[in-house]
Every structure is written in structure tokens, then in C-alpha cells.
Amino acid sequence: MSKWVYPILSIPEDKLAKAVIKNIDASVRDLYNVCKAIRGMNLKEAREFLNNVLEEKEALPFWRYSHGTSHRSNISRKWKVKSGRYPKKAIKYVLKLLDNAENNANSKGLDIDNLKIVHIAAHKGLVLKRYMTRAFGRSTRKYKYLSHIEVILGEV
């Protein structure tokens, strides 16, 4: 089994708060774009942006895995991308992860108003392989793909 390792950052360990969620039932493709959008934001800005996407006031830009994604009129010009979606399931997991990281920062005694998302990434997780029975004694494979998300908050 492989060991989970966070990336090495130049910020001292006592100024960081980390959190990870493993084996969630959300698309890695959606999680990638959510993570890219909020990377480098303050914690409050990221929460506000993600809540706006959940309420469909603002679309989440899709840089990658955007084939067939339609253009949205409510994407901000700062993203320099026209195509976007509203990946609600992925956003709910990311908001839960940000809450966990904020609680970890609070228990470390960090100032919550000055927290910034230093690192956030989505990774492929387990693949659950199952079989669905078909007619005439045949079967079809059925895959369920799981994902991991990790976040590191730093005090600025």
C-alpha cells in the first residue's frame, strides 16, 4: 500500500492546516476544474464563489475536460474562458473539505480571516469493478470511479 504524502511547501508547518477526503463518489474531471478555480483564493472568497456556483448565479469555468461544454454568459472575464458548468456534487465535497481544513486551522490557533488556499488537488481513487447480468448468460462490466481531494491552507 502506498503512503499518503502532502507536497513540500516553503511555508513553516505551524502556519499550515491540512485536510484530505479519500474515496468520494465524484468525478475527477469536475474536481480538477473546481480545484483549479479556487487555488490561490482566500478561504472566504472561495466559499462565496462556490456557493454562487451552487445557486447557479455564476458558472464554474472548465479549462480541461471541456469538450462539448457550452459557453455560459455568467462567467467572469477574469477566467479568460467561455465554457463552464455547474458541478454541484463536486462542489459539495470541496466545501466539506474546506470546512474540515478550517476546523484544523482553528484547532492549531491560526487566524481564520487570513487563511489562503496554498495547495488543492484532486486525484484518481479506487475503481470498484462490478458485473451486471445480461440476457443469455452474459454479463457486462460496470465500473465506479472514486476520487481523492487534498487541501492545504496557509496563514498569510
Curated annotation (Swiss-Prot):
Recorded GO CC terms: cytosolic large ribosomal subunit
GO-annotated biological processes: cytoplasmic translation
Gene Ontology MF term list: rRNA binding; structural constituent of ribosome
PROSITE patterns in the cross-refs: RIBOSOMAL_L22
Domain of life: Archaea
UniProt cross-references to InterPro entries, sorted A to Z: Ribosomal_uL22, Ribosomal_uL22_CS, Ribosomal_uL22_euk/arc, Ribosomal_uL22_sf
SUPFAM superfamilies: Ribosomal protein L22
Keywords: Ribonucleoprotein, Ribosomal protein, RNA-binding, rRNA-binding
Keyword rRNA-binding among record annotations: yes
PANTHER family in UniProt: 60S RIBOSOMAL PROTEIN L17
Assembly with partners or alone: Part of the 50S ribosomal subunit.
Function description: This protein binds specifically to 23S rRNA. It makes multiple contacts with different domains of the 23S rRNA in the assembled 50S subunit and ribosome. The globular domain of the protein is located near the polypeptide exit tunnel on the outside of the subunit, while an extended beta-hairpin is found that lines the wall of the exit tunnel in the center of the 70S ribosome.
Recorded family membership: Belongs to the universal ribosomal protein uL22 family.
HAMAP family: Ribosomal_uL22_A
Entry protein name: Large ribosomal subunit protein uL22
Organism whose genome encodes this protein: Sulfolobus acidocaldarius (strain ATCC 33909 / DSM 639 / JCM 8929 / NBRC 15157 / NCIMB 11770)
Organism taxonomic ancestry: Archaea, Thermoproteota, Thermoprotei, Sulfolobales, Sulfolobaceae
